């Protein structure tokens, strides 16, 4: 049996010698992203007393809609979204803060079984944000698009910089080439834990997602343009950067119809 770690920074898990998925990811082995280089990246924050704390990433897909992971928002908390963010610990002068008016979690999401898939949610914002050089909409792939093995992608986020480490202050990025489904679902990788509605990337034992990266984007270069092909979902509970345990993402192209339907009906 495998054990997974979802990558939202709120949830603390014990460790085991068995390898399960964990849904708390941050960028391990990455570097600080150049300011404004990923303007669709958002910080999802929750109210903690009189302050706010980063818990997950996400992608701005409309001026009043954000895409993130279901496991980031399936708790009774008060959330807000910060766009134009770079340094979580200081005012960059480019941020816009907006409340979350409605949360739409995929109806098939099961909190107790991240490996079943459907780890995706949409957040309707209380008001539209203003687009500028610091805040842009993420490009989504065409429905059904499957990336070839070793496609060039970057994960971005403020997650832990190492297993059991601390959240990054500034937005990080790491190069994570894709691992196709045939390889990622083989017994020496994730086996049957991975479904074809997911994308695997990384697995070199150096670079990965980690706690705090959950819900954030996997940006992949296709035909000269970066598009958001993944929503960060889970890593191995044995550690964020375990060899042959690539970071696993919800495959956005499997949910394009659902995304469009939710936005149109809300």
UniProtKB/Swiss-Prot annotation:
Cysteine pairings via disulfide bonds: 56-72, 153-220, 184-200, 210-240
UniProt KW keywords: Calcium, Disulfide bond, Hydrolase, Metal-binding, Protease, Secreted, Serine protease, Signal, Zymogen
Entry-linked InterPro entries: Peptidase_S1_Elastase_sf (IPR050850), Peptidase_S1_PA (IPR009003), Peptidase_S1_PA_chymotrypsin (IPR043504), Peptidase_S1A (IPR001314), Trypsin_dom (IPR001254), TRYPSIN_HIS (IPR018114), TRYPSIN_SER (IPR033116)
Superkingdom: Eukaryota
Enzyme class: hydrolase
CC cofactor note: Binds 1 Ca(2+) ion per subunit.
UniProt GO molecular function: metal ion binding; serine-type endopeptidase activity
GO biological process, one term: proteolysis
Enzymatic reactions: Hydrolysis of proteins, including elastin. Preferential cleavage: Ala-|-Xaa
Subcellular location: Secreted
EC number of the protein: 3.4.21.36
Domain named Peptidase S1: residues: 27-264
Tissue: Pancreas. Basal layers of the epidermis, hair follicle and sebaceous gland epithelia (at protein level).
Positions of the pro-segment in this chain: 17-26
UniProt signal peptide: 1-16
Keyword Calcium annotated: yes
Named cofactor requirement(s): Ca(2+)
Binding site for Ca(2+): 85, 87, 90, 95
Active site, UniProt feature: 71, 119, 214
GO cellular component, one term: extracellular space
Assigned protein family: Belongs to the peptidase S1 family. Elastase subfamily.
Annotated function: Serine proteases that hydrolyze many proteins in addition to elastin.
Name of the protein: Chymotrypsin-like elastase family member 1
Lineage: Eukaryota, Metazoa, Chordata, Craniata, Vertebrata
